[in-house]
Swiss-Prot record:
<keyword id="KW-0150">Chloroplast</keyword>
<keyword id="KW-0934">Plastid</keyword>
<dbReference type="GO" id="GO:0009507">
    <property type="term" value="C:chloroplast"/>
</dbReference>
<comment type="similarity">
    <text>Belongs to the bacterial ribosomal protein bL32 family.</text>
</comment>
<dbReference type="GO" id="GO:0006412">
    <property type="term" value="P:translation"/>
</dbReference>
<dbReference type="InterPro" id="IPR044958">
    <property type="entry name" value="Ribosomal_bL32_plant/cyanobact"/>
</dbReference>
<dbReference type="InterPro" id="IPR011332">
    <property type="entry name" value="Ribosomal_zn-bd"/>
</dbReference>
<keyword id="KW-0687">Ribonucleoprotein</keyword>
<protein>
    <recommendedName>
        <fullName>Large ribosomal subunit protein bL32c</fullName>
    </recommendedName>
</protein>
<dbReference type="GO" id="GO:0015934">
    <property type="term" value="C:large ribosomal subunit"/>
</dbReference>
<dbReference type="GO" id="GO:0003735">
    <property type="term" value="F:structural constituent of ribosome"/>
</dbReference>
<dbReference type="InterPro" id="IPR002677">
    <property type="entry name" value="Ribosomal_bL32"/>
</dbReference>
<keyword id="KW-0689">Ribosomal protein</keyword>
Length: 52
């Protein structure tokens, strides 16, 4: 089994973790924005039928 030679520093670990978290934040923001546009009817990327 491959074993790393040296321990990853806390700073590197924190940077990588924050980058990973930031990706999730942007995905959630995009999803929320899309949901808002669908709710208000301003969406240009989705065609949704409204039941009257």
């Amino acid at each position: 089994m491959a074993v790393p030679k040296k321990r990853t520093s806390i700073l590197k670990k924190r940077i990588r973790k924050n980058l990973w978290k930031k990706g999730g934040y942007w995905a959630a923001l995009k999803a929320f924005s899309l949901a808002k546009s669908l709710a208000t009817g301003n969406s240009k990327s989705f065609f949704c039928t409204t039941n009257k």
